[in-house]
Amino acid sequence: MAIRLYRAYTPGTRNRTVSTFSEITTDKPEKSLIVKHHFCKGRNNRGVITCRHKGGGHKQQYRLIDFKRNRHNIVAKVASIEYDPNRNARIALLHYLDGEKRYILHPRSLSVGSMVLSGPTAPIEVGNALPLSSIPLGTAVHNIELRPSCGGQIVRAAGTYAQIVAKEGTFVTVKLPSSEVRMIRKECYATIGQVGNIDASNITLGKAGRNRWLGKRPTVRGVVMNPVDHPHGGGEGKSPIGRARPVTPWGKPALGVKTRNPNKYSNPYVLRPVNRIYFIKNLMIYYYVKIYT
């Protein structure tokens, strides 16, 4: 994937970058694999906002992605590589020998015409899905299951991959893109290779309108609100938040507070948690600069 730059002939194109979409081979999705996508706009069944900053955006049709890869020992051919508006990775359309069609996440370097296979005896090639017990150490994988036969849940974003570190007993140790090291059952499936569209993180939106196209609404700082709307609000002129530490709109501590449940069931499987100190420090500096400047 390459990135296209724009000349600064308008303020909206001054810092705007977009993908060239050079890897896309067709602009029409498979009709049997798309369903209507209903936008909740951050509301629950009573119409109450439960997730702020959501709403609007372009209409989208959801592509049914095969995260389970449970068509074992049936060869499939990559028919096309397509754009998916619901994720930053590309998707690949597979045509199985028995006539079935399915979408999968497009791994890097997988091209049209390639053959992919899923199963314990599949070769170690990009796009093939195997149980973790059958994958050699040091192999890059993505779309990893956390529980057998439940479908891939982690390492699905564009450009990401995990690495097989060790095998012991009924578990396989995997190093995730966040630097977390955790154990996963050896029966869980994963796909060989790195997710494609590796330059997705280098895209610059360039203007607020592109965020609105994505269904993201503006985020207003609490310090500029009224006291009735946010604990940081109020004061005469430009004033500080008036508290010992930042809080959420509902008065709970924010920025630097651990949100993971200390009794979470998966804690014993995490051998090395994510080192969040560096990220939290930078995040707090960023928000304090926004609040006081």
Swiss-Prot record:
The lineage, from the top, is:
Eukaryota, Rhodophyta, Bangiophyceae, Bangiales, Bangiaceae
Question: Which keywords annotate this record?
Answer: Chloroplast, Plastid, Ribonucleoprotein, Ribosomal protein
Q: Which SUPFAM superfamilies match?
A: Nucleic acid-binding proteins (SSF50249), Translation proteins SH3-like domain (SSF50104)
Q: Which PANTHER family match?
A: LARGE RIBOSOMAL SUBUNIT PROTEIN UL2M (PTHR13691:SF5), RIBOSOMAL PROTEIN L2 (PTHR13691)
- Main localization category: plastid
The similarity annotation says: Belongs to the universal ribosomal protein uL2 family.
User: Where is this protein localized, as stated in its record?
Assistant: Plastid, Chloroplast
**Sorted alphabetically, which Pfam families does this protein's record hold?**
Ribosomal_L2, Ribosomal_L2_C
Task: Extract one GO cellular component term from the record.
Answer: chloroplast
Its Gene Ontology biological processes?
A: mitochondrial translation
Q: Assembly and partners?
A: Part of the 50S ribosomal subunit.
Q: Where is this region: Disordered?
A: 224-245
Q: Which gene encodes it?
A: rpl2
- Coiled-coil boundaries: none
The record's listing under InterPro entries reads: NA-bd_OB-fold (IPR012340), Rib_uL2_dom2 (IPR014722), Ribosomal_uL2 (IPR002171), Ribosomal_uL2_bac/org-type (IPR005880), Ribosomal_uL2_C (IPR022669), Ribosomal_uL2_CS (IPR022671), Ribosomal_uL2_dom3 (IPR014726), Ribosomal_uL2_RNA-bd_dom (IPR022666)
**Protein name per Swiss-Prot or TrEMBL:** Large ribosomal subunit protein uL2c
Tell me a Gene Ontology molecular-function term this record carries: transferase activity
On whether Protein biosynthesis is a keyword of this UniProt record, the answer is no
